Amino acid sequence: MTCARKGASLDWLALWILFSAWSSLSGWCLSGLGYLNPAGIIFSYSLFLAALIVFRSRLPRGSGRAGWRMLRSRRMAPRIWLLLTVLALIGGIAYSPANYDYLTYRFSRVLYWSWDQGWSWIPTINHRMNYSGTGFEWLMAPLFILFKTDRLFFLINFISYLFMPGLVFSVFSHLGIGKRISWWWMWILPCGYCYILQAASAGNDSFAAVYFLASLHYLFRVKTSSSVKNPALSCLAIALMTGAKASNLPLVLPWLVVVFLKRRNLWGKGAPAMIAAIPVAVAISFLPMALLNIHYTGDYTGDPHNASRMRVSDPLSGVVGNSLQLAKDNLLPPLMPRPIDWTPFLPAPLKARLLRDFPPLNLNSGELQIEEHAGPGLGIVLLAGLFIVMGIRARVAGSSLVAVRNNPALAVAGAGLVAGLVYMSKMGSEATSRLLAAYYPLLIAGVLVTFPLDGRMVHRRLFRWLGMIAMLSAVPLVILCPARPLFPTQVVSSLMTTSHVPDAIVARYDRVYSVYAKRSDVLRELIAPIPAGERVVGFLQTGNDAEASLWLPFGTRKIVEVTPEDSREDVKARGIRFVLVSQNALTYHYHTTISFLLAKWSGTVVAEKSIIEMANLGPETWYVISL
């Protein structure tokens, strides 16, 4: 038995990757056995813990002291990052998750799986419940099944976020970027709005960036470390990245480029480890979900008819539309006096083409950046722009600030750019800036290796001030975040009223913060008229409703989707005596009326509610029907 080297601590990143891989693997296995329940979860993670104890001497080792030394530094950059991290942690502890995608389908699918004690293809018009990647959900499932609460889910993102600074430094420096410059970016980049706003959220975009960075980190270590574990960990990390979100699949390309560049090192001791990891990597990647999508829909995406409208019909329109959305989210200040719709400013021919080929196009900018649409932010974009300008200027002037270009790093960065363009030419979503969260680190690194500068660049006052401003600009966003406000919202509303702030501004403020305050259980009042003993409740929805709140209190009832095409006998046969009906679903999706539905089902309306799920949509009418 080999002893751990003196002074070395556990490689916590490796443990996180192993834990994530085990969670995905055990989720699928327990589902197949029908044991996705407390007993199965306890047995599974007992095996994982036992394996860690038995093989503790062989676990990857790293230096855990360097990070603490950096945080104890008197320099401002680590302190600002630490401040933002603490603020994010407070928000995560204080509030229930309110991410809308999480409430509409990500947590909802976990609720279905836990009720059925395994993964299942859910009969629903919210198809995202079925075809989306499952990586984040397999981390949520054991927490929910054991503790029957969603208040711990923020820890998934928070733990992952803690690894980001060290990974940025490792990947950047291995790409040939000077260590001084890498040191600054390791603090600046994690303060990007898309990362810090999701650090205590239940969103599943930014945490995939950590898996991607980890996959490169362990590949780069193949040459400097004799450990055969690095190739295996890299393989697992890249698989986890794809399992989290299918939109991350193009990022496999730069990983393969690094594999090619490291082929001689991998051909030795690392090859058996990587080959051994491949079966597990396949199981925890997006591939199982792709195969299930093919089985149930005939298409690996799960959306053969593009019902979600997320596949653009023209690659050029995709690149242009996504670029405009990136500009809208990242070239404006984090705080704006009022919302602005930039669509009318487009030339008429371009506007017509984008609305035809890129239906989800959204050029509305709100008063502040929120996690649903945030990218890295204006400060980081300006800082990257400064490196481009200074790099060109230094090269033209023949300045000594110019560093030598690293050609292999250029190949990796070029592959990252190609991956981003592939995404932008194929995918059309209104949330481009958020969905590209895993792409930004390599794109920023691409700027730094294309326009290489000597480490003395960080001593320039302009760089330091711009870096500090970029980091500090995230502080008000974390404090003002509507999903997790760290200030007394009601007190501020009263002060605004007494200070004669225009009524429209106060009304907008009140609506946004009140909607977010209720979002985690926004539909719960629909359950109030239903007797407590009802174990199954019908649900007729639009496909984008916050279903998770209907399951409260968790474990007491199952929500089953119905449609107007179902007969009364079909509905009753499923044990349903009450149905919750969205008027918007009847009007816009099924093109029918509540009167028709009541007549068909011989039902009566026992309650009618007006509920605001999203601040920009306003109140929606809901009915509680008794059969």
Regions found by a protein language model. Give the residues of each.
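Signature aromatic-anchored transmembrane alpha helix within multi-pass, membrane-resident enzymes
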Residues: 75-83, 229-238, 252-259, 272-283, ...
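Membrane-embedded, hydrophobic transmembrane alpha-helices
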Residues: 1-71, 378-383, 426, 571
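Transmembrane-helix motifs of polytopic, lipid-linked glycan transferases
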Residues: 49-58, 152-176, 214
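Membrane-interface anchor segments at the N-terminal boundary of transmembrane helices
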Residues: 149-160, 197-198, 337-413
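Membrane-lumen/periplasm interface segments of specific transmembrane helices
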Residues: 95, 272-370, 476-483
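Short periplasmic/luminal acceptor-recognition loop of GT-C membrane glycosyltransferases, typified by
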Residues: 484-489, 503-556, 578
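Transmembrane alpha-helix segments characteristic
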Residues: 20, 82-85, 183-190, 236, ...
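Transmembrane-helix signature of polytopic, membrane-embedded enzymes
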Residues: 6-14, 151-152, 168-193, 210
